[in-house]
Structure formats: C-alpha cells, structure tokens
C-alpha cells in the first residue's frame, strides 16, 4: 500500500529493523524488550516529552511480570502501592462489592496502584541501556508506505525539517486516535460513552485512606483513589449540560470537592482533566508489515484498570515473536498469531470494563436500586463473596490457537495460559523468582526429570539456538544431590511447593514456556520430542530439521 508524500527531499535518513510510532507505555515496553534482544529500534514521538497528565492508576501482576522481563521491575515498584483493593459503595457509603485479591501466582500482587508518568519515565530511562535503541521526540509521522520488504516513514520535526525512516517493520503504538490505523482504514469498532468524567489529582492526600472507592451515587457517581507518593485522585461524572470549562471554575470545583472533603479549600491541586470513555476494538492487528498495539488496537473504559495492562500484554506477546522473525529464526507467519491470541482477550477486557462502568453508573435509576439489593444478598453467599474478593471474574488470558500445541480438552488444559512464577532455590542457595532464573527466554521445565532426555541432539541444538533454558525442578531438599546433575540443565528447588502442586494438578511433568511466560505445550519425557516438533511447525521455526520425528520409548 503506497501513500503519497509531498515532494520534499528528506534531510536525514534512519535505517532500522523496527520503527515504533509513539513513546507511550506500550511503545517504550516494545523498545525495551526488542532492545535487550539486540534489535535495532527507532521510537518516534510527536510530543516533545513524555505525557505527565492524569492517566492510568492500576497496574496488575501480569504487567509487573512484563516489567520484570526487561529488568525494570525494581525501579517500578517504588511508584506502586501493592494489594490495592477496589470497593463499590452505595450512596450511603455501604460497601456492596469488595475486590481484594491476595494471590500472587504470577510472582506479584494482583492489584496495584501506580503513578503512570513516573513508570513511563523508568521505561524511557530503560531504553538508554541499549545502544541499538533510539528515541526521537518532536517528530510527527506525516505519511508512510509499505513495500515488499520494508516500511518507509516520512517525519516532520518541530522546526519543519523532513526526515525519512526505512524500517523492516512498523509497530503503531500511537494511541486511540492512531494516525497509522486511520491511514490504513482499519475499522475501529465500538462506541463512545455519552458521559464524560473530570479527573482531579491532589498532592498531600487530604484523606489518606487506603484503596480505591467507587461510589455509585445516582446524583453524581464518583471515584476516590489513594495513589503512591501521597497523591489522591477523584473522578466525578460530568452531568448533562455541564462543560469542562464550567467545572474548572473555582466555585464549581469547590462544590465538587465538598462532596468528598470537609474542607475543599485546603487542597493542593496537581492537575485536572476531562476524559471520555471509549470501548473500541480494531478489526485487524496486523496489516502486512504494520502491527497495531495498545490503544491503537483497543481502548476501554477505566473501571477495571485494564487499558494499560492490556497494552502491556500486547507488547509482551508481540515483541518476542517480532524478534524471532527479524533474527531469521521464524517466518513472518508467526506474527499472525499476535492477533489470533490477543484480540479475543482484549474484547473480553473491554466487555468487563463496560460492565463495571454500568455497575458504577447504571443507565436507569431503578437498576441501581436493584444492584444494591441483589449485591447485599449475594454478600451472604461465601462462594459469591470469594468470587469478587479474589477477582475471579477477571478474564485471564487463555489462547485457544496460535503459537502453541494443545493435546486433549481445551477447558482444563494449562496450554495457552500464563505459567505460575513461584520462588525457587538455586544450587548456590539463593532464593529468587522463577523468571529471574530463566531470563527473557523459552524454557523447558521438568518436574524431577532431566528435560533433555526426551530430545534428540538436533532438537537440543534447535531450541538452544532460540536461547531456551532447560530447567529441572526438584524438592528443595534434593537441590544439592550431585548424582542428579545434567550438563546444560539448571536445577532449582521448589521452595514453596507450588510447582509440585501445579504439575500434579495438570497431570504433566514437562512444560514448554514461551518468553511471554505462557504455556506453549505440555508433555512427559517420552512425548516431549514429538511435541517440540509440532510446536516448531506451528511457530514456523526456520531450521530445516524441525520436522524430524523423534520420540523416545522406555
């Protein structure tokens, strides 16, 4: 697809493997991951600096695991508040739904508050670790065109200078109003909510109560959220007939804050901004050499804090696949699995967010009365209460097709789900999270067994070329048993007993884990070779001997 550009000779040229449009969180995460894989990356951003106005405030365990994968989680954690509960209140202040999960199966608290601009700054600083990654601010993407083997981008600087970029791939992380998506005429299906919300951030939190509260007041629903670094966020629905300009007037802002504070005059306003909530999904995530990610691919209301986290899932899913393709280790058909795996889950998160918004502000007043009564009764049913407390209603990502091999019934299979991340003990006695022992790699993880036993020499060579780590998990008391050591295998102790429980529950002894920590396949030692051949095929790995049939029999 060719897009014409004004006939102006470009002054500067950049030639890279991946161009990323947008220096938001998804673009910066893509840049960090690809950077550590040695990919030559250029990030182009229209603004002159990172956005610092009110944005996302919730980061989940999956997103923190993604931060961990690029070595930034320790710098991110100081800007978070772990175990951040969400409570729905009636107009009289009674809590009718409490979302307070205390599980950490992926290594991190499931719900966390955070300050997005500070975390974005951590990611921007993170790319400076890689000489192969550059970020150019004050660059407007004016046009682009696709050829058989590259994408050409035409940029304009703030001074009006023209630049041209040649890239093998373009990843569009340029937001809900994505220029790239609109230029490609990709339908952005969904709707825009009729009501807007004004967001107010206040320093030196005048309430200082923990957690986040959603008050379902039919007169004016509002949100009160405790954020890190003593910041309080209030969100108020903008009612019909009101405008942002009116609400910004001191007397009207005072009236809004008097709803939640005893002294609305004694506050330190950081900033305020009006938002419109959209629920939209791109029809396609890949268009030849262009891939859409984050808000460019899907946008959703804020009520479950999943817009940011869904973007992190996009980046984690796409980055390792793109790296394999660029490195020549897989054919570009692997990139088709990005949409296949991510689009359905993004749709599920949009639906959940819309539902949560309808709980907070039902379209009809009688629906709010019904909600309060039903929720009060359901709280007396322990299974229902646990369902909300433990956040079981959140659709966990599960892929039914794509870069995976499933054997048996999909409903009970762990394949296509994220693998757990417990603590493990290393042979030197150190205790660490599982991902830290594996790195940003594939892993073949075996309970008690040597994971190399079921593989041919050719398969070992093939999977090692991908950077695969071979892990043998043993009970912690066996970690120093010398006769169980195998060359090229990392032995770890099951510190918490969680890995033993996982393998027992799923009736498998071997797991093939992808770099994004999803289970690509399960096996036993006698079937591992056959399973790896199938996986190599569906992932379109490029080694010519990937289709050799190997299966050991005792």
Swiss-Prot record:
Pathway: Aromatic compound metabolism; 3-phenylpropanoate degradation. InterPro entries: 3-HPP/3HCI_hydroxylase (IPR023786), FAD-bd (IPR002938), FAD/NAD-bd_sf (IPR036188), PheA/TfdB_FAD_monoxygenase (IPR050631). Keywords: Aromatic hydrocarbons catabolism, FAD, Flavoprotein, NAD, Oxidoreductase. Gene3D superfamilies: 3.30.70.2450, FAD/NAD(P)-binding domain (3.50.50.60). The keyword Magnesium does not apply. One of its GO terms (biological process) is 3-phenylpropionate catabolic process. FAD binds at residues 17-46, 285-295. Pfam families: FAD_binding_3. It is an enzyme of class 1 (oxidoreductase). It comes from the Bacteria. Its EC number is 1.14.13.127. Disulfide bonds: none annotated. Catalyzes the insertion of one atom of molecular oxygen into position 2 of the phenyl ring of 3-(3-hydroxyphenyl)propionate (3-HPP) and hydroxycinnamic acid (3HCI). HAMAP family: MhpA. Belongs to the PheA/TfdB FAD monooxygenase family. This is 3-(3-hydroxy-phenyl)propionate/3-hydroxycinnamic acid hydroxylase. It comes from Escherichia coli (strain 55989 / EAEC).
């Amino acid at each position: 697809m060719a897009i014409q550009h004004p006939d102006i000779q470009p002054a500067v040229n950049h030639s890279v493997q991946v161009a990323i449009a947008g220096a938001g969180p998804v673009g910066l995460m893509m840049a960090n991951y690809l950077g550590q894989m040695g990919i030559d990356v250029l990030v182009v951003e229209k603004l002159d600096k990172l956005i610092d106005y009110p944005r996302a405030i919730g980061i989940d365990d999956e997103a923190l695991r993604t931060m961990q994968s690029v070595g930034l989680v320790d710098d991110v954690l100081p800007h978070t508040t772990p175990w951040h509960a969400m409570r729905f209140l009636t107009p009289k202040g009674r809590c009718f739904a409490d979302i307070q999960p205390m599980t950490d199966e992926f290594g991190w608290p499931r719900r966390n508050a955070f300050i997005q601009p500070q975390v974005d700054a951590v990611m921007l600083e993170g790319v400076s670790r890689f000489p192969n990654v550059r970020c150019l601010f004050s660059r407007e993407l004016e046009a682009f065109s696709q050829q058989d083997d590259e994408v050409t981008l035409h940029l304009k600087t703030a001074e009006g200078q023209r630049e041209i970029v040649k890239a093998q791939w373009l990843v569009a992380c340029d937001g809900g109003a994505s220029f790239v998506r609109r230029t490609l005429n990709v339908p952005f299906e969904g709707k825009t909510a009729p009501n807007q919300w004004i967001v107010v951030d206040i320093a030196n939190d005048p309430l200082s109560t923990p957690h986040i509260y959603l008050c379902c007041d039919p007169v004016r629903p509002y949100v009160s959220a405790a954020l890190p670094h003593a910041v309080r966020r209030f969100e108020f629905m903008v009612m019909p007939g009101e405008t942002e300009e009116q609400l910004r007037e001191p007397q009207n802002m005072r009236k809004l804050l008097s709803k939640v504070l005893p002294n609305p005059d004694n506050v330190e306003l950081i900033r305020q901004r009006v938002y419109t909530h959209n629920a939209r999904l791109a029809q396609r995530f890949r268009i030849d050499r262009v891939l859409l990610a984050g808000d460019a691919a899907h946008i959703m209301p804020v009520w479950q804090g999943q817009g940011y986290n869904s973007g992190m899932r996009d980046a984690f899913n796409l980055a390792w696949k793109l790296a394999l393709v660029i490195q020549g280790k897989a054919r570009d058909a692997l990139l088709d699995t990005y949409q296949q795996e991510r689009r359905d889950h993004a749709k599920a998160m949009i639906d959940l967010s819309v539902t949560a918004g309808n709980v907070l502000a039902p379209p009809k007043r009688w629906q709010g009365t019904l909600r309060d009564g039903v929720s009060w009764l359901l709280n007396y049913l322990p299974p229902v209460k646990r369902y909300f407390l433990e956040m079981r209603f959140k659709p966990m990502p599960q892929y039914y097709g794509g870069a995976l091999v499933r054997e048996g019934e999909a409903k009970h299979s762990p394949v296509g789900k994220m693998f757990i991340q417990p603590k493990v003990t290393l042979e030197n006695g150190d205790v660490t999270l599982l991902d830290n022992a594996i790195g940003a790699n594939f892993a073949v993880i075996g309970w008690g067994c040597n994971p190399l036993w079921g593989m041919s020499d050719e398969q070992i060579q093939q999977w090692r070329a991908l950077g695969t780590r071979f892990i043998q998990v043993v009970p912690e008391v066996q970690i120093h048993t010398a006769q169980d050591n195998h060359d090229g295998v990392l032995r770890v102790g099951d510190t918490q007993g969680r890995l033993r429980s996982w393998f027992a529950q799923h009736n498998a002894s071997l797991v093939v884990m992808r770099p994004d920590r999803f289970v690509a396949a399960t096996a036993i030692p006698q079937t591992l070779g056959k399973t790896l051949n199938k996986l190599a095929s569906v992932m379109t790995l490029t080694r010519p001997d990937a289709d050799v049939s190997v299966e050991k029999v005792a």
